[in-house]
């Protein structure tokens, strides 16, 4: 009987991509098949996120639930990867001594040999080093699961924002070679993928070397991906405003495969807070980039990230953030209360804002963002949207669902499953808080 792998993923799209590659790797090297039940697994793998304190606490809560499984089956291997593993290293075993393997985002390619070593020696295996992009040289061809796929184009971040743990857990920026990325995209397209999302912690900082020694930026990469046969839609995330270049804006204008949607995190609308965060740009510079982009691509949807309650945030700072949200006309966005991360400069700043006030500000900010997002959805009613059909509706098996260019889920009645993986024109009939309803055009 085939051995089973249970994998749980916390956090960002980079982690989702890494988890999919670990499934490919362990399937090829150890013939492990994925199971939906941890109690049936021979190997349990937890891919972790450390971006906020709550995410880190969740790791140890989950490991605690698996302790009984390990006691009942000592042959089971429990492996912890991702950013918490990178940050904590062997210290994970101080709180969870039954963990067998600890590995970082840059050492996931060593996972098969680490699992084997843990089984043979009965000793813990820990490797959270940063061998740059070596892992991509050791991964099998990606398995295809649906019409959309992530492709990692670079690793790490060198911006060192004062609140962010990423440079310490994933290392500094390293770009994959240009042709390696295109090879992966071509493989995906040959196996039915129609939409790719190019990933990086600072993806618009991509600088990949081509086969002839040139250095290509993200705009060059997007143009090359767009001509891969079968790829009809391109997204990318996550961007830093500092490197949102004119060449990238021009790519948005020139490349029809590049969606009319951009996620461009700003974090705050206060120049004082942006300086404390070491974002290295002002709100005026950010808005200038948006104006230039909207002039090049009228109607483009823009979402962002916001941190509420950063140390020292005053009522005026928060009001400036709310004003930026309104001025910029942001679509649905992500927002969180600031969470100090050990080892980051901001963790040493005095934080004297009451928690209740932080929650009040977050609620007000989210309410405003949701209002604006819903208004954009309402404006889409009556329009015809080209959507990529991805699956059956989660609530009604008689319906299919897909996504618009501006990343909205559309549910529509259809009894033709062959439409999954294809593009379809759908008339938008109704806007709901988190999705749209439509009718398939024949």
Swiss-Prot record:
[4Fe-4S] cluster 1 binds at residues 12, 49, 83. GO terms for molecular function: 4 iron, 4 sulfur cluster binding; metal ion binding; N6-isopentenyladenosine methylthiotransferase activity. Monomer. It comes from Pseudomonas syringae pv. tomato (strain ATCC BAA-871 / DC3000). HAMAP family: tRNA_metthiotr_MiaB. It is found in: Cytoplasm. Binds 2 [4Fe-4S] clusters. One cluster is coordinated with 3 cysteines and an exchangeable S-adenosyl-L-methionine. The gene is miaB. Signal peptide: none annotated. Transmembrane segments: none annotated. Its cofactor is [4Fe-4S] cluster. Residues 378-442 form the TRAM domain. Residues 3-120 form the MTTase N-terminal domain. PANTHER family: CDK5 REGULATORY SUBUNIT-ASSOCIATED PROTEIN 1, MITOCHONDRIAL TRNA METHYLTHIOTRANSFERASE CDK5RAP1. NCBIfam families: miaB-methiolase, MiaB/RimO family radical SAM methylthiotransferase. Its EC number is 2.8.4.3. This is tRNA-2-methylthio-N(6)-dimethylallyladenosine synthase.
């Amino acid at each position: 009987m085939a051995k089973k792998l249970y994998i749980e993923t916390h956090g960002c799209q980079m982690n989702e991509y890494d988890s999919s590659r670990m499934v490919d790797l362990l399937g090829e090297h150890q013939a492990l098949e994925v199971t939906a039940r941890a109690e049936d697994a021979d190997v349990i793998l937890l891919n972790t996120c450390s971006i906020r304190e709550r995410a880190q606490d969740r790791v140890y809560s989950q490991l605690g639930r698996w302790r009984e499984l390990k006691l009942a089956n000592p042959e089971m291997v429990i492996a912890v990867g991702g950013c918490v593993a990178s940050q904590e290293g062997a210290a994970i075993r101080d709180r969870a001594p039954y963990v067998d393997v600890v590995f970082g985002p840059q050492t996931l390619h060593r996972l098969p040999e680490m699992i084997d070593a843990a089984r043979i020696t009965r000793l813990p295996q820990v490797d959270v080093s940063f061998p740059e992009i070596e892992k991509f040289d050791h991964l099998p061809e990606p398995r295809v699961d649906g019409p959309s796929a992530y492709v990692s184009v670079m690793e790490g971040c060198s911006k060192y924002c004062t609140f962010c743990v990423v440079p310490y857990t994933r290392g500094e920026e390293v770009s994959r070679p240009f042709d390696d990325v295109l090879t992966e995209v071509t493989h995906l397209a040959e196996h039915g993928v129609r939409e790719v999302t190019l990933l990086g912690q600072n993806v618009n900082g991509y600088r990949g070397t081509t086969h002839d020694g040139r250095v290509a930026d993200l705009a060059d990469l997007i143009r090359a991906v767009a001509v891969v046969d079968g790829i009809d839609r391109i997204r990318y995330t996550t961007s830093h405003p500092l490197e949102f270049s004119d060449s990238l804006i021009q790519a948005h204008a020139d490349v029809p495969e590049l969606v009319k949607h951009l996620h461009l995190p700003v974090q705050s609308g206060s120049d004082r807070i942006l300086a404390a965060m070491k974002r290295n740009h002002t709100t005026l510079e950010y808005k200038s980039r948006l104006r230039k982009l909207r002039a090049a691509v009228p109607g483009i949807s823009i979402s962002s990230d916001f941190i509420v309650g950063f140390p020292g945030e005053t009522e005026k700072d928060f009001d400036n953030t709310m004003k930026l949200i309104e001025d910029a006309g942001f679509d649905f966005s992500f927002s969180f209360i600031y969470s100090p991360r050990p080892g980051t400069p901001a963790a040493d700043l005095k934080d004297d804002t009451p928690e209740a006030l932080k929650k009040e500000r977050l609620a007000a900010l989210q309410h405003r963002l949701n209002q604006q997002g819903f208004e954009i959805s309402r404006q889409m009613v009556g329009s015809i949207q080209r959507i990529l059909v991805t699956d059956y509706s989660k609530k009604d098996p008689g319906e299919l669902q897909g996504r618009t260019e501006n990343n909205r889920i559309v549910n529509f009645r259809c009894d033709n499953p062959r439409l999954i993986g294809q593009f379809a024109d759908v008339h938008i009939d109704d806007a709901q808080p988190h999705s749209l309803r439509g009718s398939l055009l024949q």
